Swiss-Prot record:
It catalyses: RNA(n) + a ribonucleoside 5'-triphosphate = RNA(n+1) + diphosphate. This is DNA-directed RNA polymerase subunit beta. Changing H482Y: In rfm2103; rifampicin resistant. It comes from Bacillus subtilis (strain 168). HAMAP family: RNApol_bact_RpoB. Changing G500R: Streptolydigan resistant. Pfam families: RNA_pol_Rpb2_1 (PF04563), RNA_pol_Rpb2_2 (PF04561), RNA_pol_Rpb2_3 (PF04565), RNA_pol_Rpb2_45 (PF10385), RNA_pol_Rpb2_6 (PF00562), RNA_pol_Rpb2_7 (PF04560). Residues 1184-1193 have a biased composition (Basic and acidic residues). Keywords: Antibiotic resistance, DNA-directed RNA polymerase, Nucleotidyltransferase, Transcription, Transferase. The keyword Secreted does not apply. DNA-dependent RNA polymerase catalyzes the transcription of DNA into RNA using the four ribonucleoside triphosphates as substrates. InterPro entries: DNA-dir_RNA_pol_bsu_external_1, DNA-dir_RNA_pol_su2, DNA-dir_RNAP_su2_dom, DNA-dir_RNAP_su2_hyb_sf, RNA_pol_bsu_bac, RNA_pol_bsu_CS, RNA_pol_bsu_protrusion, RNA_pol_Rpb2_2. Residues 1149-1193 are annotated as: Disordered. Belongs to the RNA polymerase beta chain family.
């Protein structure tokens, strides 16, 4: 026997074929959500309040400070919030201090700042009763970026951009004449020296001394028309504020507020970190030849001679001195924006581009600025300009914008913080205004603060942001993947149309950080990604992945694990996880395949710095659930990963025989299972609850503690209408530990993810029924409910106040027989357990009709019976087409009972209908390797091919689906599954480290099967064996959420479009089938004139003709002549509206009037006979318009 047994949870053992031992446990998979939100509550909010306080009025004698904040308890628990359609939130209270500096009076007060949505334990938010997920966003990190460009004449140049978190952009570029320009905030370009003069380096000589003599700077100075700081300031002011009279003072304050005001310009922590890293002098000194001697200023020791090359060793020796002041220069700008001294660090080197090697260039760094300074400084601007000139001389590197070192994640916490900042800044404006209006002596903090803008901005974010999404709850894996999704779209991100090929492509820095496989097919490919299984996000928002440290002295792999970001990893050589190690942790082979900056190289073992943690650190959680992934083509693996998320939870789930070992972790972390929070002993187990008695260890003794009650969800409707049901998997007396699974969620079995079923599959054709990937299935799977799923649909009806009086929910409905009311209770609401079909009543409701001028008889009736005789119309809730089933639950909310309802609604009734859907022809199924198909035929069991022992197989797949798709994983799974079934075991074959071909053969032989795993099959119809032996085995097949019941649709008559009078389209509108231009050609080609005529007239938009035809069919008469289509009349009206005089002439040149085209009688009839299902809103709308016109006259 190969492989070793591994325990997954309490109930499942799998034989694992992994050769590489796990050195690191998988992290909690939804940590990206929970930890980010926790940061927001602990620090993010505090940062916001510190940024905004104190708010001072215009005179400066009132000041408002935010001291502290606290969150209260949520009003309703999670489940109740969902039921009541409210937001799961807690009240935010802030302690505010108002100081009056004139009188010295201090007022403290607690102010309520609105209800704040709280994250549930599973990483979701409940907003208005719906479960939502905030997706993390991938954006460009604030920093300074340099990139090369080639103009149309083939001349090389450079561009640079300083991108802040918020504030004005600064861009540098070269032109064809080697002049360097700057753009401030996307305005017209100026020579870069204008900006330097405006900063306070007014003369040409000052600029040359600062940057260093070079031809590019000379060209730029020649182009620059300003001679001093004042003129430069005026020039910049004219660009930024065209049309306003420029003055030097205005220009100074404008430039100062644009760049040096922390409220206007923010780099954030990450921007300061990136800029300090990029503009540090050491990166540009590596491997360069010094043009000056470096001396330790304290001891006078010579560290490096002039002309010496700074290799890695020399640079490491010089580095500590660089930090401590070698090359520091203090500059005193005057006459410009900057009034304080500026500290820079500069060192002279020889230009590598100069052939003679005599040209000296100046390398300027920003002398490391503290992390607290979040705005840009003059030193940053000068260093970035210096870097740009250095690039022109071949010193420094350009940046790769798609590298994950330059892209960062904004998770929930930061997105919320940005939104909260918008609300607070709006509130700040209001506070200032109120300070100046109200009486300063009697004022309180509560009167100053208006919390509306804060609440509005939070509501707007959760309700309508592109990143706040309705959770995909089809199954636990879909839920988990949605929480780990990374999107490059959204506010401040990319748009689908503008995103090019490069952004979407797989980049080497994605390794271990973003999954190269899981991404949608279609317009979003590459823009929406998934976090890799081991990845974490650091405090700057960069994605880190873990590596095992290799000790540089001994060359052994240590137990220490370092999390590296993409740009840190670029400095190291990393070995693969499958590099062979001895027992000591030393590499066995002399030369090792390793990665360095995206290149795969073979290096000697003493050059390796790190080693991968696990082979599956490359891929995401969903991709890691595909066994034999390494044998699949990546395009098909992508489909496999995506289709697992569409698996419908089955009535009887079953974990795969051939898994990867990820099933347990995915199921546990998804949030669908019930997890034990404290160790203890199970005391009682029911369908809806599990009770666990806690115990604590005290002096080595187990002491009983409290009793914890865990409630289970039973038959709840998920966001996607699938059935969400939890069932206990522990028994009374079990000892449970913290983190253990107490109850399975949907699509789980014994704690493992179970998306489908293990079925016996044969690769063979059968009378052409599996042409084009179609699937042939045995009727056994229908009879035994193997692929039966439960679906719950929610319908609601609300009784509102209308202009004509309130609507009423009642059993007393006009023109409805007693038979239709048999299942309604005395309130007019359907009873639980009733079976309903399409069109049945669910909730009886009547709406008052518009009162017209009454006749004498009606007035008499009114006088006798009072209001009873008021006309009402039936607006009851009925079962829509295809929505029949059994009433599972009814919920009634009444305004009188104190339920919170939207304004104008008096009563709300929700009806839940449950359907049990067996698998049927037309349903879509798939394996885990992208092998998808539609069921074309369900054969009786006796007609299916059978094995020599008489067992009929369950499913037949087309063998032609394998070779061209190159997903051989399915064949290996098939063989392994068959062996596992014979041996009665479950198997774990982890990705990139699973069972090899030899393992499969050995396992087959162990199970007593032939090595090729082929069998003789007999035809179920004749009993004859088929000509060739067939591959038969167990494959894990899932039923996808694309079910034929949801797509089936038919219409006889229904709603019509208002202008063209043609039927609407689509199932949702109960529309017709489109008969387009090409279909018309087809009928013309056949010469089917009458068919064509009725399709274009009575079946579409001949208003009178279709009514007559309907009547004729009902009465059994002959169908009348078609009339003129409505769209023809619309066409004429359109031409007339363009000012053309269009007339219709008969055959004898007589003009025909539009209204002559239909008889007066027919028109009346058409009005009288309203077809069933006509769109009511449209009728009433037109009627209202007419009525308005009459009253105005």
């Amino acid at each position: 026997m190969t492989g070793q047994l591994v325990q997954y949870g309490r109930h499942r053992q799998r034989r694992s074929y992994a050769r590489i031992s796990e050195v690191l446990e998988l992290p909690n998979l939804i940590e990206i959500q929970t930890s980010s939100y926790q940061w927001f509550l602990d620090e993010g909010l505090r940062e916001m309040f510190q940024d905004i306080s104190p708010i001072e009025d215009f005179t400066g004698n009132l000041s408002l400070e935010f001291i502290d904040y606290s969150l209260g308890e949520p009003k309703y628990p999670v489940e109740e919030s969902k039921e009541r359609d409210v937001t799961y939130s807690a009240p935010l209270r802030v302690k505010v201090r108002l100081i009056n500096k004139e009188t010295g009076e201090v007022k403290d007060q607690d102010v309520f700042m609105g209800d704040f949505p709280i994250m549930t334990d599973t990483g979701t938010f409940i907003i208005n009763g719906a479960e939502r997920v905030i997706v993390s966003q991938l954006v460009r990190s604030p920093s300074v970026y340099f990139s090369g460009k080639v103009d149309k004449n083939g001349k090389k140049g450079f561009t640079a951009t300083v991108i802040p978190n918020r504030g004005a952009w600064l861009e540098y570029e070269t032109d064809a004449k080697d002049v360097v320009y700057v753009r401030i905030d996307r305005t017209r370009k100026l020579p870069v020296t204008v900006l330097l003069r405006a900063l306070g380096f007014g003369s040409d000589q000052e600029i040359l001394d600062l940057i260093g003599e070079n031809e590019y700077l000379r060209n730029t100075l020649d182009k620059d028309n300003t001679e001093n700081s004042d003129k430069a300031l005026l020039e910049i002011y004219e660009r930024l504020r065209p049309g306003e009279p420029p003055t030097v003072e205005n220009a100074k304050s404008l430039l100062d507020s644009r760049f040096f005001d922390p409220k206007r310009y923010d780099l954030a922590n990450v921007g300061r970190y990136k800029i300090n890293k990029k503009l540090h002098i050491k990166n540009r000194l590596f491997n360069q030849r010094l043009a000056e001697t470096l001396v330790d200023p304290e001891t006078g020791e010579i560290l490096a001679e002039k002309g010496q090359i700074l290799d890695r060793r020399t640079l490491d020796k010089v580095l500590p001195y660089l930090e401590n002041g070698i090359g520091f220069r203090k500059l005193y700008p005057n006459g410009g924006v900057v009034e304080d001294e500026v500290t820079l660090q500069s060192i002279k080197i020889f230009a590598p581009t100069d052939q003679e090697g005599e040209q000296v260039i100046n390398v300027i760094g920003n002398a490391y600025i503290e992390e607290e300074i979040k705005n840009i400084t003059p030193a940053d601007i000068i260093s970035s300009i210096s870097y740009f000139f250095n690039l022109l001389h071949g010193v420094g590197d350009t940046d790769d914008i798609d590298h994950l070192g330059n892209r960062r994640l904004r998770s929930v916490g930061e997105l919320l913080q940005n939104q909260f900042r918008i609300g607070l800044s709006r509130m700040e404006r209001v506070v200032r205004e109120r300070m100046s209006i109200q009486d300063t002596n009697t004022i309180t903090p509560q009167q100053l603060i208006n919390i509306r803008p804060v609440i509005a901005s939070i509501k707007e974010f959760f309700g309508s942001s592109q990143l706040s999404q309705f959770m995909d709850q089809t199954n636990p894996l879909a839920e988990l993947t949605h929480k780990r999704r990374l999107s490059a779209l959204g506010p401040g991100g990319l748009t689908r149309e503008r995103a090019g090929m490069e952004v979407r492509d797989v980049h080497y820095s994605h390794y271990g950080r973003m999954c190269p496989i899981e991404t949608p097919e279609g317009p979003n490919i590459g823009l929406i990604n998934s976090l890799s299984s081991y990845a974490k996000v650091n405090r700057f928002g960069f994605i880190e992945t873990p590596y095992r440290r290799v000790d540089p002295e001994t060359g052994k792999v240590t137990g220490r694990i370092d999390y590296l970001t993409a740009d840190e990893e670029d400095n190291y050589v990393v070995a693969q996880a499958n590099a062979r190690l001895d027992d000591e942790g030393a590499f066995i082979d002399d030369s090792i395949v390793a990665r360095f900056r995206g290149e795969n190289t073979v290096v000697s073992r003493n050059r390796v710095d790190y080693m991968d943690v696990s082979p599956k650190q490359v891929v995401s959680a969903a991709t890691a659930c595909i066994p034999f992934l390494e044998n699949d083509d990546s395009n098909r693996a992508l489909m496999g990963a995506n289709m697992q998320r569409q698996a419908v939870p089955l009535m009887q789930p079953e974990a795969p025989f051939v898994g990867t070992g990820m099933e347990y972790v995915s199921g546990k972390d998804s949030g669908a299972a019930v997890i034990c929070k404290h160790p203890g002993i199970v005391e009682r187990v029911e369908a809806k609850n599990v009770w666990v008695r806690r115990y604590e260890e005290v002096d080595g003794q187990k002491v009983k503690g409290n009793l914890d009650k865990y409630s289970l969800l039973k038959f709840v409707r998920s966001n996607q209408g699938t059935c969400y049901n939890q069932r206990p998997i522990v028994s009374v007396g079990d000892e449970v530990v913290k983190g253990e699974i107490l109850a399975d969620g949907p699509s789980m079995e014994l704690g493992e993810l179970a998306l489908g079923r293990n079925v016996m599959v044969g690769f063979m054709t059968w009378d052409g029924y599996n042409y084009e990937d179609a699937i042939i299935m045995s009727e056994r799977l229908v009879k035994d409910d193997v692929y039966t799923s439960i679906h719950i649909e929610e319908y609601e009806s609300e009784a509102r106040d209308t202009k004509l009086g309130p609507e009423e929910i009642t059993r007393d409905i006009p023109n409805v027989g007693e038979d239709a009311l048999r299942n309604l209770d005395d309130r007019g609401i359907i009873r639980i357990g009733a079976e309903v079909k399409d069109g049945d009543l669910l909730v009886g409701k009547v709406t008052p009709k518009g009162v017209t001028e009454l006749t004498a008889e009606e007035r008499l009736l009114h006088a006798i019976f009072g209001e009873k005789a008021r006309e009402v119309r039936d607006t009851s809730l009925r079962v829509p087409h295809g929505g029949g089933g059994i009433i599972h639950d009814v919920k009634v909310f009444n305004r009188e009972d104190g339920d919170e309802l939207p304004p104008g609604v008096n009563q709300l009734v929700r009806v839940y209908i449950v359907q049990k859907r067996k698998i049927s022809e037309g349903d879509k199924m798939a394996g885990r390797h992208g092998n998808k198909g539609v069921i074309s035929k369900i054969l009786p069991e006796e007609d299916m091919p059978y094995l020599p022992d008489g067992t009929p197989i369950d499913i037949m797949l087309n063998p032609l689906g394998v070779p061209s798709r190159m997903n051989i994983g399915q064949v290996l799974e098939l063989h392994m599954g068959m062996a596992a079934r014979y041996l009665g075991i479950h198997i774990a074959s982890p990705v990139f480290d699973g069972a090899r071909e030899e393992d499969v053969w050995e396992t087959l032989e162990e199970a007593g099967m032939s090595r090729d795993a082929k069998t003789v099959l007999y035809d179920g119809r004749t009993g004859e064996p088929f000509d060739n032996r067939v591959s038969v085995g167990i494959m894990y097949m899932i039923k996808l959420a694309h079910m034929v019941d949801d797509k089936l649709h038919a219409r006889s008559t229904g709603p019509y479009s208002l202008v063209t009078q043609q039927p609407l389209g689509g199932k949702a509108q109960f529309g017709g089938q489109r008969f387009g231009e090409m279909e018309v050609w087809a009928l013309e080609a056949y010469g089917a004139a009458y068919t064509l005529q009725e399709i274009l007239t009575v079946k579409s938009d001949d208003v009178v003709g279709r009514v007559k035809t309907y009547e004729a069919i009902v009465k059994g008469d002959n169908v009348p002549e078609p009339g003129v289509p409505e769209s023809f009349k619309v066409l004429i009206k359109e031409l007339q509206s363009l000012g053309m005089d269009v007339k219709i002439l008969s055959g004898d040149e007589e003009e025909i009037e539009m209204r002559d085209l239909e008889d007066e009688e027919d028109a009346k009839q058409a009005d009288g006979l309203a077809l069933s299902g006509d769109e009511e809103p449209e009728e009433t709308a037109s009627a209202d318009v007419e009525r308005d016109v009459v009253t105005k006259e």
